[in-house]
């Protein structure tokens, strides 16, 4: 959720940021919805779940106090859109998960390793590349070029594109 929403915001904020007639920012929600629809059509999943960071300190902050210390504050124009995206997911009847002390990528990792079958993870977060596993049928669908292009990475494609192995 977070990585796609951030990408949606920055991919659409270079020009006029979209707002409703009453002033609510919607550019990231609009782009997120478009990407979600594209992903759902591409994969046609039996189940779908979106993972969010809660924005609070996690166990990693306890281990390394300066974890993510250099990050800029999230723009207020984007902060306001997180609730709208959650509302949209509820309207789509798509489950979303967020937990104190656990980041979204950890939630994704837990779910990917818990379930069997073809698992497609939509994210631009390269940290998730480590989850790619051809034997477990786990692949990453990465957003490229803003929000318009989706590349699918399995073990072969990961090595061909980045000279990396997931484990």
What is the meaning of each model-derived region?
Residues 14-19, 69-167:
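Extended two-metal-dependent nuclease catalytic cores across DNA- and RNA-processing enzymes
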Residues 61-66:
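Glycine-rich loop at the start of a catalytic domain that most often binds anionic cofactors/ligands
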Residues 1-49, 53, 59-60:
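Non-catalytic, usually N-terminal nucleic-acid engagement modules in DNA/RNA processing proteins
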Residues 57-60, 129-131:
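Short catalytic/ligand-binding loop motif for oxyanion handling, primarily in non-cytosolic enzymes
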Residues 46-57, 96-106:
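A broadly tuned preference for mixed-charge, low-complexity surface segments
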